[in-house]
Amino acid sequence: MPKLTCLFSLATLATFALPLAAQDASRINEIIVVGVQDSHTVATDDTLVAPADTAQMLRKMPGANLNKNGELTGIAQYRGMFGDRISVAVDGAQISGAGPNSMDAPLSYAPVALLESLTINRGIAPVSTAQETIGGYIQAKTYSGEFGGREAFEFTGRTYFGTQTVNEGVVASGFFAMTNRHHLIRGFVMNESASDLEFPDGVITPSEYERERFDLGYSFRRGEHTFAVDIARNNTGDAGTPALPMDILSIDSDLFRTRYRHTGTAGTLTAELFGSNNEHWMTNFHLRRPPQDNMMSPGRMRFRQTFATSENLGFNLKYEQYVNNGVWNYGLDGHFTNHDAVVTNPNIGPFFLTNFSDSQRDVLGAFVERSLVVGETMGLDAGIRYNRVTMNTGEVGSNLNPMNMPAGMPVTMNNLSSLLANGFNNADRSQVDNNFDWFARLSLEGSKGITWYVGAARKTRSPSYQERYLWSPMESTGGMADGKTYVGRVDLNPEVAHEIEVGFDWSGANFALYPRAFYKNVIDFIQGTPATSAVANNIAMMMSNMGMGAPDPLQFSNAEARFYGFDVEARYSLSDRLTLRAIANVVRGERKDINDYLYRVSPDNVILALDYASEDWLVSLESISYAAQDRISLTNLEQATEAYSVLNLSGLIEFAAGAELRLGVENLLNEAYFDHLAAYNRAYNPDIQTRSRMPGLGRNIYGRLVWYF
């Protein structure tokens, strides 16, 4: 019922807003903008990209990085925050994946071969960008084609072929469009696959993957009106996630989105509707070595498979009103999700554990935002947002004694599980949060090309469905990958962050410098703390004795935390053809309630690159250096990592009109290192000790052939 009400409200508001958008605004002649570089965009046409996972492109952005759990399972990190704290949109659509461990993180729905650009808001994100932006906002834009310039239809497109040596990966895709002045019909098809990854001392097993994608869309444009509709099928097959307790058997997703835009003289009205249905199978036996019993033969009692689903439905309704000294932005938005997951044993039919049952998380939001110019040198952006978050979940259960044994560990575990399930089912599981956000950013143009900047914000985030409704000790944690089991807490408070950011933009004819410093204090930060339930601790210990999971589970709880640091982006043109680029990142994440650091925070790192550009070719030498990370979470039993540096070499040549060949070598010297954000090995592997740090990849020679027609 809330979803139907929201959609009715969307249609009603659009009806009243259309006349407003058509009002005469002849008084508006020009909008002057005073501001700073508040976003960073990586366009795939301008960037040499080797990986299949779009999230890996975040490493080239100031303040950003990724938590890597597999080759297709990168989770965005920004200034120390990651996962659900980062709002990620794919073509304006929010996607909550089916996997309770984020095997299908949002950026996995925008494959590199389909990607046009990836944009991150530097620092404080305006409240108009998305609903919950406590940790930042990222926008992935896929290829959609362009309208033609005449009435006759034209056939255009883009083909993309690639291969790489580190895992024998191959990718082939094609984007095709029929277009004229008013109509755009488009389609996309992609297939990619790879074997296990290599590192200097061996092979990472399992890390293979296979994925295919199909898209079909139509756009119409006439006068001030534009309409678009797109549907897509995103299928992932076998894909290893060695940092997690299971691997991907399949992820089958159906996605749709529609958009209407009216661009008038008074303002711009945008209405979007989007949704997806996602089904996900994962196992602990089909890609990695199955669990072993004491005789080192397959322990059939410990085979596990999980079937998980998610449903997404959402809308955005925004009106941008032009006024004499700036812009007003008004908006309503909604995102409604439903999650289910059940764990079974393919060898024993009666065995099951309901991981999540009809877990709902519905967010309705409204915002008002103002951008204005004060005088000729000062710009101000400010806004407020209200989000109402409604959550609930169904009853759960389990059968951990499928053989009906009269005594023994299965009986005890089943009884303990029943105690947890009964306590959970008898509790009031419905929760409502009323969250308020605000932000303000001031820019002041100074002398010598310098623009000064200061910003402040209050941002909130309600708990995820895992944090509230994980009733039994398990690793369904949204991709934490710390090897710990967790239980949720229904009555968690929303996180509240207060942040301040300062910096400046300084640019001239041959240089640019964009530094930012930030401090963020988070009240009720959701963090795992030692579980106090004797029942949960006992069942976790028994599972650990069976070789499944770890003892001493954590419980999602409200704590106090802070993040601070700086990041800087710079470039300097040594000549008309030679350019030096640099990005540096420093971030600290600390608990304030106890003396401990936060888990999985990116080490300090620096990227230095030297580019030489000719008229039809480009070559780039890049050095990537990471400092040692010994500021580690004792609560999460995090392991320290050492410093390392790698060299990358890449080049591009346009050998024919619209045809480009891109070649590169990553880790040119085949250095051995450990990626702090890649977590730990959870699968049997003769080359990597179980629960030890995942190694960095070895030398990777790659090529991409792109043809635009």
Regions found by a protein language model. Give the residues of each.
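Short acidic/polar hinge/loop motifs at secondary-structure boundaries
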Residues: Q94-I124
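Face-selective signature of the C-terminal outer-membrane beta-barrel domain
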Residues: R221-N234, S253-N422, A427-D428, N435-S447, ...
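Outer membrane beta-barrel strand-and-loop segments of large Gram-negative receptors
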Residues: D215, T306-K318, S359, V363-F367, ...
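C-terminal beta-signal and adjacent terminal beta-strands/loops
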Residues: T460-R461, I523, G528-P530, S625-R631, ...
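Periplasmic-side early beta-strands and strand-to-turn transitions of outer-membrane beta-barrels
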Residues: Q139, S144-F147, F153-E154, V171-D254, ...
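Extracytoplasmic beta-strand/coil segments of soluble accessory domains associated
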Residues: A55-G97, R122
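N-terminal periplasmic accessory domains that precede
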Residues: A52-M57, G74-Q77, A89, A105-A110, ...
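Gram-negative outer-membrane beta-barrel transporters
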Residues: V373-L380, R388-V389, A512, F518-V522, ...
